[in-house]
Amino acid sequence: MSISNISIKAVLTMLLTCGLAVAQSPSLLKPEEKAASSPATNLPSEATVNSFMQQTFGYEAQVTWKISSIKPAPVPGLAQVDVILAGPQGQQLSRFYVTSDGDHAVIGEIIPFGAHPFAAVQKKLANGAAGPSRGPKDSPVLIVEFGDLQCPACKAAQPAIEALVAAEPTVRFVFQNFPLEMHNWAAKGAAYADCVGLASNEAFWKFVSKTYDAQSDITAANADEKLTALADGAGVKGADIAACAATPVTKGHVDASIAFGKAVGVTGTPTLFINGRSIGNISQVPAETLKSLVDFAAKQGK
């Protein structure tokens, strides 16, 4: 849909949630992002985007923004614009698309289309999802969550995800780290989680649950202390986990998980994939709908 002053006001509330977050830096355009344009794509200038934002949000004194990136969209003929919005509800990176003539902006997801729209992503996930897992590896249903331990929406979604996995013991469930750069201890949390997972698959799930429970008490300043204690509480040696989390190797693991998420189209946390089908705002999806999606995927996978 095209953006209007009325619709974008409504969309602002939706955008300022973790569910539509994009793992991008709050900095202005990076050189590699500027170089990503191709002759076939007409990219709007920073000045034009800023003017658009001013005309759209200027009446909202509490809303500020910063351009994160302007680059070609995954499909021809559209430019993808990522802008960090900040308001009373917090800070979040939102995305919209601009048509090649520069006359229209579009809010919404670009989703796969075709006779088998989820097959390509399903194959990538089956081959590349390497995080801690539960359930049989030969299951016809693969559920992959991309999560951020500092994201409140991820915490809110956990009961629904845990209930789904508990009710469907024959599915395979994999967790992939996807810390958002706008969260100041998320990357560290992901590093600790990675190390806990390597030490003990059982301890990993306890660590994730405990970290979500303690989420509001963790800050950038006390993250090492809190996460070390949580690792101890999960049944592994916290000091060893802290040492592991600080290594370049672990950073590489986390960076690889983020890159993998981007490669399968993750634009926010939590994102759940059920046999390649992407589901956001998980806590808002009724349990019976999630079960129906799993049952349908199981039938399709046979």
Predicted feature locations:
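Bacterial N-terminal signal peptides that target proteins for export
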Residues: 2-12
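C-terminal cap of thioredoxin/glutaredoxin-like
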Residues: 3, 24-46, 50-107, 228-302
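Sec/Tat signal peptide C-region and signal peptidase I cleavage site
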Residues: 19-23
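A short, surface-exposed interaction/processing loop segment used at functional sites
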Residues: 100-132
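A short beta-strand-turn-helix
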Residues: 124-141, 165
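Structural alpha/beta surface segment adjacent to cysteine/selenocysteine redox centers
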Residues: 144-232, 262-267, 293-302
